[in-house]
């Protein structure tokens, strides 16, 4: 699921979604995306990685039959024209959490939950794994020092 796919991300401008798009592209996928508003630093990061949408907004022509699947961001509404077009064309659709779960189906998971300290604890675990040269994927709510992204899958 991680390489050689044609993927469209609806609501690509979010902090997590744009990092996901960049990560998927670096893994060898063809990635496109759409959003109605994109702010910094997402805007610069998407442009730097040639992932910034050609025009802002949601357009049914963004959903082509050669897509392997579509990933939706948390702000994607059920009446979104791209989402409706993907459904009509029977293109598999994953929400962000569904995609992360599917991406980690065959992996050991460490999940940090709670009200406070999740990013800090996750960051500590990431640094321990990195220091011990253990390969790992991660999804973290904020930026951890020494890591360029909040997601690597």
PLM regions and their residue ranges:
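Phosphate-binding loop of NTP-binding sites
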Residues: 4, 23-26, 47, 61-65, ...
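Short acidic-hydrophobic, aromatic-tinged amphipathic segments that line or gate anion-handling sites
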Residues: 53-58, 94
């Amino acid at each position: 699921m991680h390489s050689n796919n044609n993927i469209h991300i609806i609501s690509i401008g979010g902090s997590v979604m744009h990092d996901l798009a960049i990560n998927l592209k670096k893994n060898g996928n063809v990635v496109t995306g759409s959003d109605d508003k994109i702010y910094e630093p997402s805007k610069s990061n998407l442009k730097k990685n040639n992932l910034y949408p050609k025009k802002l907004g949601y357009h049914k022509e963004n959903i082509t039959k050669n897509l392997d699947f579509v990933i939706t961001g948390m702000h994607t509404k059920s009446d979104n024209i791209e989402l409706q077009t993907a459904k009509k064309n029977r293109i598999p659709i994953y929400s962000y959490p569904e995609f992360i779960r599917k991406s980690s189906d065959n992996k050991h998971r460490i999940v940090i939950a709670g009200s406070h300290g999740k990013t800090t604890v996750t960051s500590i675990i990431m640094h321990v794994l990195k220091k011990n040269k253990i390969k790992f994927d991660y999804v973290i709510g904020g930026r951890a020092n020494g890591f360029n992204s909040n997601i690597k899958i």
